[in-house]
């Protein structure tokens, strides 16, 4: 995992997509043009948390290194240090894989 020079703010996280298999269970090879973008990723940076109504900082549940699932249209695609990454709010994350 490369060290990125970017720190997300508030309740945002930076995610690196985890590529899916190139083959189906039956052995059919899926070409890149037919693949959907993966909805699974690894958290590589997290913000400090959002402020609640009382001004208290609420820390994020996800941590750097967590493997997560997120919605198909979640996040904003960015390029940081030449790497394609996603920046999304923690609320866009559906869950942490065990």
From Swiss-Prot:
Signal peptide: none annotated. PROSITE patterns: CHAPERONINS_CPN10. GO terms for biological process: chaperone cofactor-dependent protein refolding. One of its GO terms (molecular function) is protein folding chaperone. It is found in: Cytoplasm. Belongs to the GroES chaperonin family. HAMAP family: CH10. This is Co-chaperonin GroES.
């Amino acid at each position: 995992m490369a060290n990125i020079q970017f720190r997300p703010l508030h309740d945002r996280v930076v995610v690196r997509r985890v590529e899916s298999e190139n083959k189906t269970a039956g052995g059919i090879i899926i070409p890149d043009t037919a693949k959907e973008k993966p909805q699974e990723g690894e958290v590589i940076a997290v913000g400090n948390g959002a402020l609640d109504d009382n001004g208290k900082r609420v820390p994020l549940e996800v941590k750097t290194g967590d493997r997560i699932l997120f919605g198909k249209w979640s996040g904003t695609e960015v390029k940081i240090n030449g790497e394609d990454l996603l920046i999304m709010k923690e609320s866009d994350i559906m869950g942490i894989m065990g």
